[in-house]
From Swiss-Prot:
The keyword Phosphoprotein does not apply. [4Fe-4S] cluster binds at C66, C67, C131, C162. Its EC number is 7.1.1.-. It comes from Chara vulgaris. This is NAD(P)H-quinone oxidoreductase subunit K, chloroplastic.
Length: 244
């Protein structure tokens, strides 16, 4: 097999007129014979690099919730995701794909960003599940849930579902492979901007310094004597939660 580097200024139309077959990101097995036109493959370094990347994706499994159980079934023999060249890695320095499956909390956000920064370039992200994409059922009144992992790291493929099926995960990997096949290695493949890609509402809870109101004082006064109550209550009475 001979690989010929084509200059960008070369006229490809003249080559097509000579009945040359262009095999770009082909998955079929190559065969050689006595005919020269089927023994020589004409391609570019860009397509060759993209073919090598999409054929050897090494994912870093970042499972935090029930969505990861669906992804774990892909490792078995029923779905066999090794046929796509995926090799699970436990170190971010050996991975070029991170799959976030499950809820991401505020305390876990710095660790996730650090794992993403330690991955080798070029790197890709698949957001798996409703909790990862929008916060899921925790997106309305949760104070500790990140409402979308794309606010922390750039996302290439979104897999909605609660949880998504293994077939949907395979389809997401195929779509990511198509994105990699169309990339230009001379350009930066990410222009990350913080955007709201979904409708989300922030919680309206305000946390004062005390958690005692008039009802709690009345309940305590019925159970304790006056001396014990005055010695116990050293904080001014205020509402526990007030709505803005």
């Amino acid at each position: 097999m001979v690989l010929v580097y084509l200059n960008s200024n070369l006229n490809l139309r003249s080559l097509k007129e000579t009945n040359h077959d262009f095999l770009i990101n082909s998955t079929e097995r190559l065969t050689t014979n006595q005919i020269l036109s089927t023994s020589v493959i004409l391609t570019t370094m860009n397509d060759l690099t993209n073919w090598a990347r999409l054929s050897s994706l090494w994912p870093l499994l970042y499972g935090t919730s029930c969505c990861f159980i669906e992804f774990a079934s892909l490792i078995g023999s029923r779905f066999d995701f090794d046929r796509y060249g995926l090799v699970p890695r436990s170190s971010p320095r050996q991975a070029d794909l991170i799959i976030t499956a499950g809820t991401v909390t505020m305390k876990m956000a710095p660790s996730l960003v650090r794992l993403y920064e330690q991955m080798a370039e070029p790197k890709y992200v698949i957001a798996m599940g409703a909790c990862t994409i929008t916060g899921g059922m925790f997106s309305t009144d949760s104070y500790s849930t990140v409402r979308g992992v794309d606010k922390l790291i750039p996302v290439n493929v979104y897999l909605p579902g609660c949880p998504p099926k293994p077939e949907a995960i395979i389809d997401g990997v195929i779509k990511l492979r198509k994105q990699i096949a169309q990339e230009n290695t001379n350009q930066k493949h990410f222009s990350f901007e913080h955007k709201h890609r979904y409708f989300s509402t922030n919680h309206k809870l305000n946390y004062p310094t005390t958690c005692y109101n008039e009802n709690s004082v009345n309940l305590l006064s019925q159970q304790l004597s006056n001396n014990d109550l005055f010695s116990f209550m050293k904080i001014p009475v205020d509402n526990c939660f007030t709505e803005e």
